[in-house]
UniProtKB/Swiss-Prot annotation:
Keyword Transport: no
Name the UniProt record assigns to this protein: Dihydroxy-acid dehydratase
Phylogenetic classification of the source organism: Archaea, Methanobacteriati, Methanobacteriota, Methanomada group, Methanopyri
Organism of origin: Methanopyrus kandleri (strain AV19 / DSM 6324 / JCM 9639 / NBRC 100938)
Similarity remark: Belongs to the IlvD/Edd family.
GO molecular function, one term: 2 iron, 2 sulfur cluster binding
Residues with N6-carboxylysine modification: K121
Subunit composition and interactions: Homodimer.
């Protein structure tokens, strides 16, 4: 066992003395040492129950003959950080999670680990660490939040964001706004729709790094604790069998994850995260894979924000295994999960229980996948749009650019009534390096929706979007403005064309004119300190997953 590095031999007497100080017995010294990475937090709804989930994982490890050691790393709530300077730390926190897990696992020579995570950047951060370390590893995702209820209608956090615009337009009263605030998020778990956290939980399950039906099992269900306990038992099996993360995280696993992502209509953030995890696993993956699989995979689940269904509905319909069953002919099901079990076994033991929630391939929500990759002179290295939450009337749009150099400027203009139907809102210098941190533009996009402009105004940015964003919103424009991408020199009134069916994003400016503008362009000067300064210097583009060099 790898943990022998700290517990075997005469020369390890002082090491064992320190372990004895932690209460270890002779019997435990002979067993596998398993790190249990807890991301419990009192300020993050998706993580405020993970102390109990962690205890269940530890119980499972003990039942199987291992020795659990609880360690911690950070957790952030994107919703709380949204539209503040704090949101600049969201995407960079993914790298911190990966680095801190790597650090503690390597320093203390654990034989394997289980990470208990829920929210947007914590899930991919844990997966990146698993791929990097290539040890026996498993993930337990904390589970979705239940939807709230107002006047008999189900609501969630995105309703609260969109209500701000509706209130500014006089569509709802202050009392209605406050009631939504009180009821949108009724308890623990990751926000109730197919937003980023839940999409990444689904990707984790498809990859084989979490237990059967872990992703859709709500945070409030006792089944979540049983899944956690079972994961603890099976990580000990993985250690005994020598199954490591890269045995699971193959190219076939990533292709399956992308295909299921397209069927679910998941968050565009999965593009960033799957590219980053694949890079850590030394697996070749690119935007071209997303583009190809988007063209040939139907969108099967009308999940919020692009439809009426929540994660609770997906859970009742059979969860991720049921979606995989519908796609089984196109998936690589002979690969293994983190404990060495066949993925085919998972699919064969499930069934689709609700055909409204999980549509048959012959009768999909859309013929093509829920995320589309765009190219053009405005995005030479690509951009993404979530068609699962886009009305077909906005698949083509042409309009004058209204240009902003920050999210705050754009939000003020939108809420101030300065955007007209037909416009294309351009928000730049919000990319990985430019922000720095590639903030999510949920506040401006939600404001457009709340003000009834989502069927007539497009938004284009080198920043990101929340998984809760809906409407004609194009993100991840690459190269980003701060690194000299064409979006840096778009001028007020330039005509921008979006054509989803043709996969194009263009600005109606001749190449020679764009080149001339870029020759005169200089990046803006701003003062960035601390971690964000180091992040800006090291981060790659969105088309590469915004990983560090």
């Amino acid at each position: 066992m790898r943990s022998g590095d700290i517990k075997e031999g005469v020369e390890r007497t002082p090491h064992r003395a320190l372990l004895r100080a932690c209460g270890l017995t002779d019997e435990e010294m002979d067993r596998p040492f398993v790190a249990v990475v807890n991301t419990y937090s009192e300020v993050v709804p998706g993580h405020m129950h993970l102390d109990k989930v962690t205890e269940a994982v530890k119980a499972g490890i003990r039942m199987a003959g291992g020795v659990p050691f609880e360690v911690e790393t950070i957790a952030l709530c994107d919703g709380i950080a949204m539209n503040t300077p704090g949101m600049k730390y969201s995407l960079p926190s993914r790298e911190l999670v990966a680095d801190t897990i790597e650090t503690v696992i390597e320093a203390h020579r654990f034989d394997g680990f289980v990470a208990i995570v829920s929210c947007d950047k914590m899930v991919p951060g844990a997966l990146m660490a698993a791929a990097r370390l290539d040890l026996p590893a498993a993930i337990v995702t904390g589970g979705p939040m239940e939807p709230g209820c107002v006047d008999g209608e189900r609501v969630d956090l995105i309703d609260a964001f969109e209500a701000v615009g509706a209130y500014e337009e006089g569509e709802i009263s202050e009392e209605e706004l406050e009631e939504l605030e009180q009821r949108a998020c009724p308890g623990p778990g990751s926000c109730a729709g197919m937003f980023t956290a839940n999409t990444m939980a689904c990707m984790t399950e498809v990859l084989g790094m979490s237990e059967f039906n872990c992703a859709a099992t709500p945070a409030t269900e006792a089944e979540k604790l049983r899944v956690a306990k079972l994961t603890g038992m099976r990580i000990v099996e993985a250690i005994e069998e020598g199954i490591t993360a890269r045995d699971v995280l193959t190219r076939e696993a990533f292709l399956d994850a992308i295909r299921v992502d397209m069927a679910l209509g998941g968050s565009t953030n999965t593009v960033l995260h799957l590219l980053a995890i694949a890079r850590e696993a030394d697996v070749e993956l690119s935007l071209d894979d997303f583009d190809e699989l988007s063209r040939e995979t139907p969108h099967l689940c009308a999940m919020r924000p692009g439809g009426p269904y929540t994660m609770r509905d997906l859970y009742e319909a059979g969860g991720v295994p049921a979606v995989m069953k519908e796609l089984a002919d196109d998936l690589h099901l002979d690969r293994i999960d983190f404990a060495g079990r066949s993925m085919r076994e998972r699919v064969e033991r499930t069934e689709v229980k609700d055909r409204e929630v999980i549509r048959p391939k012959e009768d999909p929500v859309h013929e093509e996948g829920g995320i589309v990759v765009l190219y053009g002179n405005l995005a030479p290295k690509g951009a993404v749009i979530k068609t699962a939450a886009l009305s077909e009337e906005m698949y083509e749009h042409e309009g004058p650019a209204v240009v902003f150099d920050s999210e705050e400027e754009a939000t003020e203009a939108i809420l101030g009534g300065d955007i007209d139907p037909g416009d294309v809102v351009v928000i730049r210098y919000e990319g990985p390096a430019g922000g720095p941190g590639m903030r999510e533009m949920l506040t401006p996009t939600a404001a457009l929706c709340g003000m009834g402009l989502d069927d007539s105004v497009a938004l284009v940015t080198d920043g990101r979007f929340s998984g809760g964003t809906r409407g004609p919103c194009v993100g991840h424009v690459s190269p980003e403005a701060y690194r000299g991408g064409p979006i840096a020199v778009v001028e007020e009134g330039d005509t921008i064309r979006l054509d989803v069916r043709e996969r194009r994003l263009e600005v109606d400016v001749e190449d020679e004119e764009l080149e001339a503008r870029l020759e005169e362009w200089e990046p803006p000067e701003d003062e960035v300190t601390g971690y964000l300064r180091r992040y800006r210097e090291l981060v790659r583009g969105a088309d590469e997953g915004a990983v560090l060099r």
